[in-house]
Curated annotation (Swiss-Prot):
Residues of the site described as Cleavage: 37-38
Signal peptide segment: 1-30
Name by which UniProt lists this protein: Protein AimP
RNA-binding recorded as keyword: no
GO CC annotations on file: extracellular region
Key words of the record: Latency-replication decision, Secreted, Signal
Organism: Bacillus phage phi3T
Alphabetical list of NCBIfam families matching this protein: AimP_fam (NF033802)
């Protein structure tokens, strides 16, 4: 169950970073790293 939850967290983080990338391409990679790091800390 933890793997499934962690997978969902990663997918959500990627979706958020993708939307952020659509709004601002120049900061897409930076916001992606921050989002993933926050997701890992939360899990």
């Amino acid at each position: 169950m933890k793997k499934v939850f962690f997978g969902l967290v990663i997918l959500t983080a990627l979706a958020i970073s993708f939307v952020a990338g659509q709004q601002s391409v120049s900061t897409a990679s930076a916001s992606d790293e921050v989002t993933v790091a926050s997701a890992i800390r939360g899990a």
